[in-house]
Amino acid sequence: MANILKTIIENDKGEIRRLEKMADKVFKYEDQMAALTDDQLKAKTVEFKERYQNGESLDSLLYEAFAVVREGAKRVLGLFPYKVQVMGGIVLHHGDVPEMRTGEGKTLTATMPVYLNALSGKGVHVVTVNEYLSERDATEMGELYSWLGLSVGINLATKSPMEKKEAYECDITYSTNSEIGFDYLRDNMVVRAENMVQRPLNYALVDEVDSILIDEARTPLIVSGANAVETSQLYHMADHYVKSLNKDDYIIDVQSKTIGLSDSGIDRAESYFKLENLYDIENVALTHFIDNALRANYIMLLDIDYVVSEEQEILIVDQFTGRTMEGRRYSDGLHQAIEAKEGVPIQDETKTSASITYQNLFRMYKKLSGMTGTGKTEEEEFREIYNIRVIPIPTNRPVQRIDHSDLLYASIESKFKAVVEDVKARYQKGQPVLVGTVAVETSDYISKKLVAAGVPHEVLNAKNHYREAQIIMNAGQRGAVTIATNMAGRGTDIKLGEGVRELGGLCVIGTERHESRRIDNQLRGRSGRQGDPGESQFYLSLEDDLMKRFGSERLKGIFERLNMSEEAIESRMLTRQVEAAQKRVEGNNHDTRKQVLQYDDVMREQREIIYAQRYDVITADRDLAPEIQAMIKRTIERVVDGHARAKQDEKLEAILNFAKYNLLPEDSITMEDLSGLSDKAIKEELFQRALKVYDSQVSKLRDEEAVKEFQKVLILRVVDNKWTDHIDALDQLRNAVGLRGYAQNNPVVEYQAEGFRMFNDMIGSIEFDVTRLMMKAQIHEQERPQAERHISTTATRNIAAHQASMPEDLDLNQIGRNELCPCGSGKKFKNCHGKRQ
């Protein structure tokens, strides 16, 4: 039933008839545009932009805009888009994929939808697989866009943030897929809005769309955090400090299994790490290491919560079964803190600060389309994951290429012997040959064989894109022999040299079948472009990977019975069997990518929430007091609710400790202040007192701008720190739930549930840290420049505390320990001249 519906809904012939009618409407403007002067034609761009701003849709501008581009291309490039190219352009504008054969002019096809969508002023990204193609297409097609009055930018990895920003501000931006991804991630790590380089993702037109959205779909783009050596040192430093504490230096809340430093513990930390104030914004990272070291040393118990294996690894003990949980690690840096405690090697020190897969990157665009010569085989995946249809576009001229049936040999050796003989025979008559391989090693092997056979040739291994294009451009010349890995040279046409058509055109030889039919079709498509003659022939052996996986044993018996060790089997049935095997592999790969997406969707939803809130903070030109005060309120509520079932004395003591060490000035609240109050009244009492402390803290900042700056940096530093740990934790969770699949549990469902719980825990942790830092930070006039320093260098830089000079006539006994030192150093008195008392 599903297949019948699919046939009805996606009737390609009906779609092509509709596109032909739309293309005819574009052609009706041909004479009108041809009659315009250059200046009149260029002025159309301004006219279209104004019409769009006045409410006309891009769809209604399509016919005239496409006609303008056709005429412009004729005048500037000497190229006049065919009807099939106009049809392809319409498909691209509608956010789908036109399947256009190699040599049908995909680059020119793209100019029409790119121009049309650039009129909105929201930006168009033309995405390519390498920087050579970005620069080539931007240079060649940029000439047309610039002539028509649109700005064109090229985004390269080597460009500075300012240059990247300029490139993204252009109407049309050429870039590789990876650079767009990394720029997106980096934009969501900056502290200032002006340091972001991208605009909101609007329209992407992806060249070689199958390569980027299918083959590389699972590739994660990763921005790593602090380096391993630095973080490893911090774990050890924090552990050493925590081990030096006395029982009075920390407070344990047994019920919630939490631990924090007492006043004396804070004093010792500030002395040990030579800090002015442990809870300054600068020290977010260090407090995180100390918190974990406290938990590792005084809450997590050896042989109860974890064991140390013979391989010197920390293994978590399942509290219900008593068994160790292979592959599972504590999140949030706790596992590393335990490793430091037990003196075993610290693992996973390099953290992922941000990551995204291409699947989720490109699904963020408002509109996504792409071009390929071979997309129909992956149509189901394009539709399911990206909501994109694949529409085959007819060729401008009929395909003349002859595709021979596969030749199957018993061994790899006999196969390659036949390949070399075939190449040599064609070389001797002058017919150009392109030999496609699946691996660099195969290319080198065939190259040696051809050298021995006296056949001059070029080898292309996709190592140098600039050299690659030159070799591919010459591959259609008389007598040219080129060996290339399958992906090499995509995006560059092979044009036939003089006299080659009479010899049968370019012959493409495949040395084995790829597990994807699409890659084989791409290789075939190198020959027979734009109605040129050509041939394709695949050579297979029973020892090829694909044949080994599917049914080579039965065929092996046939070869042995017929004694055909050097001869080949050729039949259409064999070709069909190979394609059936490829379909099975493609199905497996599709299922794998789909499962990866299910996992990644959990991260995507969480990332979008964090990045949206982060963007709101960065771009806010307002006082963020309501947001911070709401965090303080929720933190108080969590703490009080977390002790609701405890005995009254224990509950009040725990809440009091929380208030004293995280919320209010030391000794400003006592047990008597809270006793006799209901939980609701306790929450309100603490919140009202906290608001006074908040007002006192911000009043120390010199002006409204300094307050905004302080609020932003405070929130962003905490969020970034916690988010980095959370990404790490999700990675570890994913590895762990994979093992649960063996216990009849659905790992994806478990990952979703556990990931959701961890996300909520992270939000609570963010709000707790923001509360603690806001209330306990020592704020002084130097706060603003301090806040702009980068957090990752904090703990290692705050080593030497210098002493400033003190007025001679001052009575030091009159100064409180936690007041600012009168010497003007900005430190607390106890950490400065008070040390001498």
UniProtKB/Swiss-Prot annotation:
Residues at which ATP binds: Q85, G103, E104, G105, K106, T107, D493
Protein location: Cell membrane; Cytoplasm
Main location: membrane
Residues that hold Zn(2+) according to the record: C821, C823, C832, H833
Assigned EC number: 7.4.2.8
Role, per record: Part of the Sec protein translocase complex. Interacts with the SecYEG preprotein conducting channel. Has a central role in coupling the hydrolysis of ATP to the transfer of proteins into and across the cell membrane, serving as an ATP-driven molecular motor driving the stepwise translocation of polypeptide chains across the membrane.
Protein family according to the UniProt entry: Belongs to the SecA family.
Name of the molecule in the record: Protein translocase subunit SecA
Species this chain originates from: Streptococcus pneumoniae (strain ATCC BAA-255 / R6)
Organism phylogeny: Bacteria, Bacillati, Bacillota, Bacilli, Lactobacillales
Name of the encoding gene: secA
